[in-house]
Amino acid sequence: MAPLRVERAPGGSRLGVTRAQRPTALCLPPLLLLLLLLLGAVSASPESLNQSLPESQNQSHPTEDSLVSKGKMEDYETHVLPCWYEYKSCMDSVKDWCNWTLISRHYSDLQNCLEYNADKFGLGFPNPLAENIILEAHLIHFANCSLVQPTFSDPPEDVLLAMIIAPICLIPFLVTLVVWRSKDSDAQA
């Protein structure tokens, strides 16, 4: 770390400066630092930026493209809602909503309908309405589904003892067998 020197600023206050003539960090009281931090956070928030604009600038005027897009979204919504109602009626007949094999066809049909109609009306997929429908489906039907992983437990004591004792008993037998066979091969040589 570079050693510090203290120099006087042109206004007369003392500043810490490193040997490379770079000023050191200002030493401000913690309360003042906290106040500055809070003021910076409040003034930089998007809400405060929007409030500082005049109201005439906050309201955007609809353009021809936005009206056409809004009309497409309304048409898209009228064509997609029957898909949603069909999905809901099919899901109501399913007993286990967390079993993917039972619900995958209905879920895929809903997604295909959303995608097909988005392409038909020249909208991208996913779009805000499709996202809302999919989110609604997840909140209604899959909120209580979680990944169920099997929990492993210890085997019963008799099985556990057999699994421990069997290798312990086999080791002396195998050592005896190896020694006996090595003596036998030495005797033949």
UniProtKB/Swiss-Prot annotation:
The record marks 153 as: Required for CALCRL interaction. Disulfide bonds join 83-113, 98-145. InterPro entries: RAMP, RAMP_sf. Pfam families: RAMP. The keyword Transcription does not apply. Its main location: membrane. GO terms for biological process: adenylate cyclase-activating G protein-coupled receptor signaling pathway; adherens junction assembly; adrenomedullin receptor signaling pathway; amylin receptor 2 signaling pathway; angiogenesis; basement membrane assembly; bicellular tight junction assembly; calcium ion transport. The chain crosses the membrane at residues 158-179. Ubiquitous. Expressed predominantly in embryonic brain, lung and gut and in adult heart, lung, skeletal muscle and brain. Residues 49-61 have a biased composition (Polar residues). It is found in: Cell membrane. Residues 180-189 are cytoplasmic. Residues 45-157 are extracellular. Keywords: Cell membrane, Disulfide bond, Glycoprotein, Membrane, Receptor, Signal, Transmembrane, Transmembrane helix, Transport. Residues 49-69 are annotated as: Disordered. Residues 1-44 form the signal peptide. GO terms for molecular function: adrenomedullin binding; adrenomedullin receptor activity; coreceptor activity. Belongs to the RAMP family. Heterodimer of CALCRL and RAMP2; the interaction forms the receptor complex for adrenomedullin/ADM. Heterodimer of CALCR and RAMP2; interaction forms the AMYR2 receptor complex for calcitonin/CALC and amylin/IAPP. This is Receptor activity-modifying protein 2. It comes from Mus musculus.
